């Protein structure tokens, strides 16, 4: 692809199952772009062997790690038979392209697919804060790879040119508190409006009295997020877009 992408996101911030499901969160790593990358994986016992399961990639907030979201999703994932994975960003204070994605996220998902029976048309993104922003960008870069995205407390910059990269209008839901000091309603509504103008169907939920703290309301947010995500899947097998980040 001949796009010249000079985007550095410095943010606020298997045919049969070869690995057994477990009720333990496992910390593991892969090598991606010649770098060792850590992640936290939870494949609950409720995931039936040989039955394709959905996968949610959880992108943590700035200053945290993948475990911070996996811990909050674990019980719900067990109830709904969802495999979840929380990768660590290279720099804990931010997510950035190209070091953290899309290639790293693609490598991570494909690695999990090689060990578990994942439904390739039901691979989703969920992000909080800095991770929410990154999830929105990944939805644009890899619109034919990720089926749908939920962002909690995140927004794009106004009139973001990367919106034009999307070959598919990824279903997106955004949750934001009416008292979030980092993401004012005006900014989040602007993201919704910019995406809507380009043909995206964006669901925006403004949570009355809620601030930026996802962790205190995680069970409610997670359930609402899954209610949105599970309605969507790719209409055909995923296609991964390769970018030349050096031009």
PLM feature spans:
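Short beta-strand/loop motif that positions the catalytic acidic residue
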Residues: 174-176, 180
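A domain-start/cap signature at the N-terminus of enzymes
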Residues: 17-55, 100, 107, 126-138, ...
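Bacterial N-terminal signal peptides
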Residues: 6-14
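Primarily recognizes the serine-hydrolase "nucleophile elbow" in alpha/beta-hydrolase
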Residues: 69, 114-115, 121-168
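Histidine-bearing beta->alpha loop at or near hydrolase active sites
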Residues: 92, 207-214
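Conserved alpha/beta-hydrolase "acid-adjacent" motif
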Residues: 181-187
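Serine-hydrolase catalytic machinery in alpha/beta-hydrolase-like enzymes
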Residues: 25-46, 50-121
